[in-house]
A protein has these predicted regions:
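Short, intrinsically disordered linker segments that flank or connect zinc-binding domains
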Residues: 187-191
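Long terminal segments
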Residues: 216-220
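Ferredoxin-type iron-sulfur electron-transfer modules and their immediate structural context
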Residues: 2-167, 171-173, 177-180, 193-200, ...
């Protein structure tokens, strides 16, 4: 099936999301809440595009909009730019300290609105990526709490989580750097909890926190061998080479 994006013919399969098709063809669509490791969420709505079918156009969220037939897609026309600019300023109101949001506002010439009251000191746009990463890749230690303008991401009762393993997946996927994580040579601190770091017994590289390694080993049903992924691969290669007489 062929659709056109900004006048460019793009091959695709029925059911593919517009964002996937655009990126595969080198067409830029801005996103915040999207990560290739997870299904689309449509939370930030920054990836809106206009889809025209049979002469009728409508604004859709490209990361969760599956193509079901031939259509024309516009990622940066006047209608899209106007709505995207409003979305960016609303996101800036939510996260005025985010340099990423400020850069996007400048890049897409988002109009300024004095009537929006900014939330002081915030970088979080409530995209939900951190919660999704923790739930799908780790232990589900964080969640959204409260409602309205007081809605935020937190551990239960804002106390150090008893189940958090300190893997840092939440901070890694955060698009605005809202989650604070700090490390020394021996410790990692995140969500007001400090974890002891484990180093590779061969090369000394940081592998992860003790809790993270225990959790991963338990899920895999294997014992931890004390090696990082690189040294483990090297050891396996050495075994193969020895057995082959190389």
């Amino acid at each position: 099936m062929i659709i056109t994006i900004n006048g460019i013919p793009c091959e695709c399969e029925k059911g593919e999301y517009i964002l996937q098709i655009a990126r595969r063809n080198g067409i830029e669509i801005p996103t915040l809440c999207h990560h290739d490791a997870f299904a689309g969420q449509g939370c930030c709505r920054l990836c809106i595009v206009e889809v025209v079918t049979k002469g009728r156009g409508r604004i859709v969220v490209s990361c969760v909009y599956p193509v079901d037939g031939e259509c024309e897609v516009y990622t940066d026309n006047e209608r899209v730019r106007r709505q995207r600019g409003m979305i960016l300023r609303l996101l800036e109101t939510r996260a005025p300290e985010s340099k990423e949001i400020q850069a996007l506002c400048e890049k897409y010439n988002a109009p300024k609105f004095d009537r929006f009251i900014k939330i002081d000191g915030s970088k979080c746009v409530m995209c939900g990526l951190c919660v999704k990463a923790c739930a799908e890749l780790s232990v589900g230690a964080i969640s959204t709490v409260n409602r309205g303008v007081t809605k935020e991401i937190a551990t239960p009762y804002h106390e150090p989580s008893s189940v958090c393993v300190g893997c840092g997946s939440c901070a890694h996927v955060c698009p605005t750097g809202a989650i604070e994580i700090s490390e020394t040579n021996d410790t990692r601190t995140i969500w007001d909890k400090t974890f002891k770091l484990v180093h590779c017994s061969s090369c000394g590289a940081v592998i992860g926190t003790e809790q993270e390694i225990w959790y991963a080993a338990d899920r895999a049903g294997e014992e931890f061998d004390g090696l990082c992924a690189t040294c483990r691969q090297k050891r396996i290669a050495d075994v193969f080479a020895h057995n082959a007489g190389v």
